[in-house]
Amino acid sequence: MATGKILQITGVVIDAEFPADGLPQIYNALEIPLGEGRSSLICEVQQQLGDSVVRAVAMSTTDGLVRGMDVIDTGAPISVPVGPETLGRVFDVQGRPIDGEGAVGTTKTMPIHRPAPTFEEQSNRAELFETGIKVIDLIAPFTKGGKTGVFGGAGVGKTVIIQELISNIAKEQSGYSVFAGVGERSREGNDLIHEMKDSKIPGTDQTVFDKTVMVFGQMNEPPGARLRVALSALTMAEYFREEGRDVLLFVDNIFRFTQAGSEVSALLGRMPSQVGYQPTLGTEMGELQERITSTKTGSITSLQAVYVPADDYTDPAPATTFAHLDATISLERSISEKGIYPAVDPLASTSRILDPNIVGEEHYRVATEVQRMLQRYKDLQDIIAILGVEELSDDDKLTVSRARKLERFFSQPFGVAEVFTNIPGKYVAVGDTVKSFARVLAGEFDHIPESFFFMKGGIDDVVAAYDASKQ
């Protein structure tokens, strides 16, 4: 292992000189010993500048570094621990436990930079993945082994949907999940860990946390850590996939990955591109997204929260992410303002597998009919605002009445939000969702006021609440 010296420190970017015959390769991890009582600082090589000098980005704070300090080339990229022993643990970008529970009981490690599966290794089966959330399962169904993006501005409920899905999958499907906290609030990460530890899996003494690996590089971390933490989490998920498992990867928030890349790019002296983003935006996103895929041995199903700056979907960061997704779930502020949660816009959300050959004729028919009715209601809203509902034709009055019921029926109580709403969470199977919406469309519940459809699980809950109100 070659040893060099620090030449220059600019924020989190470090220039180091090495012997000509020991120049570190791009993406190699460099180690800077910090002396007594402090763990070493790890940097990642980003550029070879010539004259045996490399430029690297630090994975933690550069406080206390001075020129002339020793830098050791580890000869390999950053590696993280993998295997079942990582379940129920919390890690940082370097794979070091940050939960105070001691060392991880595994010696297996994998580098965070790996090639994506080849065409021959990839699987192209299209299969619906049940989430238990009505609006998602009906309108924008997940693809098993696919990528879904949850788009929304600040405070419309992206993180809550992710928390509910982790909980549902652990309880209903006994699956493993990997959670990457990329540049989000540490408080939310802390809340998530405690909620998962309190959430028991029915019929066992295990909690949801015991089936989840958590990797954090939060807002207070340097941009290098926020840029690489998604790769660390993905590497842990890839191990489970190669062992033949179907694993879930949650990334909250993929926009912060792009944002960190932009910061690193500026520090490395690259010319900024559109709206100040890095010129390598598409390449960086592609390198991450192409690794999130299904192979013939197992699958990684991914859900990514995507912050939309100023609710502008044409911003390069969300626009670049769109290209990689199989399904998009769009959260609208106008829906959350009505108090309807999850605030999913059924007209703006899409899925590649909403196809009669995959989800079945009945599911496809009900989903498209629901969208048609909601679109008609949206078209009529201008007329209603000017003239009032009474001026509509009888057919349009019926459409408006049913559309308002559908809109409220898309709301659903979440288990993870029970402490705020005091309503127990509901998991609704896909079959029940399709049947319930088909019955509402058919007019079977035209006699029930729309308020009874709000915050219910299946249609039986609506009927039960209505019957109870008459007694």
Curated annotation (Swiss-Prot):
Protein name from the UniProt record: ATP synthase subunit beta
Broadest EC class assigned to this enzyme: translocase
Top-rank taxon, per record: Bacteria
Sequence similarity: Belongs to the ATPase alpha/beta chains family.
Enzyme Commission number: 7.1.2.2
HAMAP family xrefs: ATP_synth_beta_bact (MF_01347)
GO CC terms in record: plasma membrane; proton-transporting ATP synthase complex
Catalytic reactions on record: ATP + H2O + 4 H(+)(in) = ADP + phosphate + 5 H(+)(out)
Gene3D superfamilies found in the cross-reference section: 2.40.10.170, Bovine Mitochondrial F1-atpase, Atp Synthase Beta Chain, Chain D, domain 3 (1.10.1140.10), P-loop containing nucleotide triphosphate hydrolases (3.40.50.300)
SUPFAM superfamilies, per the entry: C-terminal domain of alpha and beta subunits of F1 ATP synthase (SSF47917), N-terminal domain of alpha and beta subunits of F1 ATP synthase (SSF50615), P-loop containing nucleoside triphosphate hydrolases (SSF52540)
Function field: Produces ATP from ADP in the presence of a proton gradient across the membrane. The catalytic sites are hosted primarily by the beta subunits.
Lineage start: Bacteria, Bacillati, Chloroflexota, Chloroflexia, Herpetosiphonales
Topology of the protein relative to the lipid bilayer: Peripheral membrane protein
Molecular function GO labels: ATP binding; ATP hydrolysis activity; proton-transporting ATP synthase activity, rotational mechanism
Protein location: Cell membrane
Residues noted as binding ATP in the record, renumbered to the chain: 152-159
Subunit structure and binding partners: F-type ATPases have 2 components, CF(1) - the catalytic core - and CF(0) - the membrane proton channel. CF(1) has five subunits: alpha(3), beta(3), gamma(1), delta(1), epsilon(1). CF(0) has three main subunits: a(1), b(2) and c(9-12). The alpha and beta chains form an alternating ring which encloses part of the gamma chain. CF(1) is attached to CF(0) by a central stalk formed by the gamma and epsilon chains, while a peripheral stalk is formed by the delta and b chains.
Keywords: ATP synthesis, ATP-binding, Cell membrane, CF(1), Hydrogen ion transport, Ion transport, Membrane, Nucleotide-binding, Translocase, Transport
Chief location bin: membrane
InterPro entries attached to this UniProt entry: AAA+_ATPase, ATP-synt_VA_C, ATP_synth_F1_bsu, ATPase_a/bsu_AS, ATPase_alpha/beta_chains, ATPase_F1/V1/A1_a/bsu_N, ATPase_F1/V1/A1_a/bsu_N_sf, ATPase_F1/V1/A1_a/bsu_nucl-bd
